[in-house]
Amino acid sequence: MNRIDERFAKVKADGRKALITFLTVGDPNMEVSEKAIYTMQEEGVDLIELGVPFSDPAADGPVIQRADERALAQGVDIFKVFELVRKIRNNVEVPMVFLLYYNVMVQYGIEKFFKRCQETGVDGLIIPDLPYEESDEIKEYTEKYGVYQISLVSVSYTHLTLPTTM
């Protein structure tokens, strides 16, 4: 059972809604990102989305785009994000998921990326530019390494396509 399953079972048992937070790692810097994650845990969040900075975050709005630019200007990349998760994982029980673009995974190497997620304690991935219908190519790795893919549903989905994709 993944930390996400455990947390959502607790949320359900408590009869409450989950509080999910987001931050772009490295904005304004790595130290503040680390402190923010600890603060989120102390304040009782249920899941933390860690935005992995990307040079062309087409699926994100202007606020996240500017945050990515600031983090990238400081040299934050997937290697530094993995290192942060590795550093804090033993002290952070809250599930952590990456919000990242598929190209980051491809450049890293797909299986190597999933293995690193497992090693560092990343619980799941939100990949906005990988449509669910095309996600079969990573399914074997999500299962092998126990890292969840959390799919997004676009406003262009209809009542006809949604049941076939979920």
Residue ranges and their predicted role:
Residues 68-126:
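Active-site beta->alpha loop and helix N-cap motifs at the rims of alpha/beta catalytic domains
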Residues 49-76:
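Glycine-rich, proline-tolerant flexible connector loops at the mouths of alpha/beta enzymes
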Residues 2, 59-61, 76-83, 108, ...:
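Active-site-adjacent beta->alpha loops and helix N-cap segments on the catalytic face
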Residues 1-20:
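N-terminal amphipathic alpha-helix/helix-capping segment at the start of soluble metabolic enzymes
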Residues 159-166:
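Single conserved hydrophobic/aromatic residue that forms the stacking wall/gate
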